[in-house]
């Protein structure tokens, strides 16, 4: 039984005794509870509390005397929270939060997680009965109460997501099955997909010579379900079910990786988003692109730097992203998802409220999973915003992220109906009223539902027939509608409509903004119940004409095409519209701007100038320049107005700005000049004019790209020819050593390649890692490009910095056409690490056969002595190995380090290959020069079947390497629980030590696998075994910083005060690592706070040396001797004076340190103590 592993704890023993005394279930419950508590990373106190609560009705006061206050308190909390079960669904949430207020804040997190344990047991987390009514009820409690709580803790987000999907599985099994069905269809061999992408990215990282990491995640069925509803899309339209994230060193590497991804994969251009150049409003930065899956599932990729990743995970980007919340409700077969977002910001006496509410309703068909083409129909509506100015509203703060259902502004009063999952009951809103008299009124109001049938309304407005379909959901709240209309006359002037009318005794406001004729578009309908004493007839004020005109300008097709960043622009405008509207509207109306130009500050003129150029409001530009707008003023990215004009390709505005002093060579923060922007616009005349007006044609960006690089990357041959004609350096290199010819080859553009070479581009130019242009052509996979470059003199035998030729690349790609082309043009097939080695490693028998027929040496060796057969064995391809041996390859060949063919086969983990080699006389007992056997290599591979087979075939399970490592050491180091179990079952000696004195338990602790450590201890390994330097298992666990491992070792009898040969205890280690939690835990288990090392230094000396006030205070509080001396006669105060830490010194003196100890300090240091602590009266 699992729980029996920790029964050395007296509290647990007593709890188990009481449990068996009063409960019928003698075995399964404690076992399951122990598993759940460990999964939630709870300690023995929680396990004990749950056991006690199970028979709480039988306990008396005497029974409680055996347990400490923490355990008794946890039992009480579990008992209180269990009352939620008996509350109606609508009252569960408010009752849960009322109880939260009664829990000690310091213990609240542990108490909530502990109370979750019996709930998870009741829904039978390991054997769910999804149709069980009790399981449904408990999953509702978890969803309603626990998940919102866990989401408020970043550390528990993963647990919350796991529970979300678990409850989804219980509450909506048909929907989950449907989603899983689609997932299997979209990604039928997901493991292979992941493996291939990881391999490809490894190649990309190596080519760029960068240290990077790649991780992936598979979206949970619950997340997929929510997203399909919120985004109004079918599951097959999702791009991020499988998503990868590449973390690279810097911003430059992000773009380098992105370029290679576009070359290697078929990416979806419309899904490429550059959040690095154009960050989200919360500061989020990353490159997003989508790899096409053809007729199967697409794959999303995020590329970000280490700094960007930290900001996303832990900075403001993470915090703001988590503002979004949603709720799901279900009635019969109708599911409604309501998504809320609110931002409240207070500055300069303005409270800005930005609200986004989307409600989606869908009808569930339980048989949807049988029809891939079924796409549910949804409706939704868009954003609203308002702001107001008050006299003094600083006392009104909303400390939590809030989600308003409904917002009104009437007679200088702002009213918000707030639904805050952390503070407000499920079926109530918080009504907040704010007004100019600085009063704030809070009132809980019930969520009322009005039964209004879905309606169709038809009326005529501005010569347009309007047909409205709406379905109200909540009373006193906005709800969505879909409006369809047909244009009657060509000259109809369609404006935004704001209509108030009465329907079914409800006053209804409609706001909609038509964009295109003859189509459906979203509308917002708001309504309020009619009250006889109510003077409010309009919930939302009509949008102002200037706002509508601005939106029309933004949505103008020509403007958007010129700007080229619709999504970025829309986000920017929507976010800042409430604060910038008074200024932005001036751009739309130059006559109004002229009236108010003298009232606008210079900084606002500069801002208006850039914004006007971005939005295409060109009429305002001359007026702003005439009245002093600075054309060289920059925004936060270093962009000046001339950059904006160049990006839009506007030659006339560029001339006007330059005439008024704009710097034609101005650079942005990433080093892009105006000429770079002009090249991106593709305007040949603008580029020519800039060059003729002193724009630097040789200017480089921060990563070394010239304007020629840009022109080539945009495949603009006219611009390339123009730039060359004006003297652009065709051989200029980026910081990575890439020329424009590299770029042309990357894009596969034969015409540009020919153009550049004919104008002097070096066909053998190398990157910083030694790759020539020919390498890029092989990477692109085009025989035509390769042939063209060879015809122009490309060196087919040029080597990279690591000694590889282009033929290696071609062989690695498996492209026989390219290999043949290169060899027939003189590529050498027999280098040190031959082409044949590469072909064998890829497992490509046809390619190996072809190369040998073309005089590749089958007996060739690498510099480290590896033969072709070694590489073939590592590939795991039995047919290839068999073919090579039949063609006289040596089965007994060894590398310089003594590794045989069989070692390489074991490394691959291929049991069939290993079996075949041994049958063909390969030596099963062969050792490398370091003493590693075939079994050692098999243990490294982690292949359980292979290890088991080797043992059964007489491989020596007790074999040691030259340093004394057994197979068990290797298995423990890898953290492989099943492999260790297998070895123990087959009789390995678990207490065997290496030459340095390390046991398998030392290795297991370093692996961090708690279950593996527990298994070894259970099987009798010495928990207090020491290395040759005296380090115990506990020292290793403390050094690793694992509270769980330390707790387990202490429970299983580890000596907390054991010392190393230097006299260091585990407490010394914990203090040195500045780990407050570990120090506390060790002292709980009896660590000697005054233990001295061989130099006479206690843990307190260490705490002072490492300048940790918290540790000093904790040690003193637990009895550390503050006047103790080391072997040199120095007290801890000497160290304090050396580091001049006043706070620690005060702590010591208040704790009773003797500053008058004989010969303790010189007089000048004693005076320093008194000066540092002058505000303390020391007797």
From Swiss-Prot:
Which keywords does the record carry? ANK repeat, Repeat
* Coiled-coil stretches noted in the UniProt entry, renumbered to this chain: none
Q: Which GO terms describe its biological process?
A: guanosine tetraphosphate metabolic process
So which domain of life are we looking at? Bacteria
Q: Which InterPro entries match?
A: Ankyrin_rpt, Ankyrin_rpt-contain_sf, NT_sf, RelA_SpoT
Report the SMART domains cross-referenced here.
ANK, RelA_SpoT
**ANK repeats located where?**
282-311, 604-633, 637-666, 670-699, 703-732, 736-765, 769-798, 802-831, 833-860, 864-893, 897-926, 930-959, 963-992, 996-1025, 1029-1058, 1062-1091, 1095-1124, 1128-1157
- The entry's protein name is Putative ankyrin repeat protein RF_0381
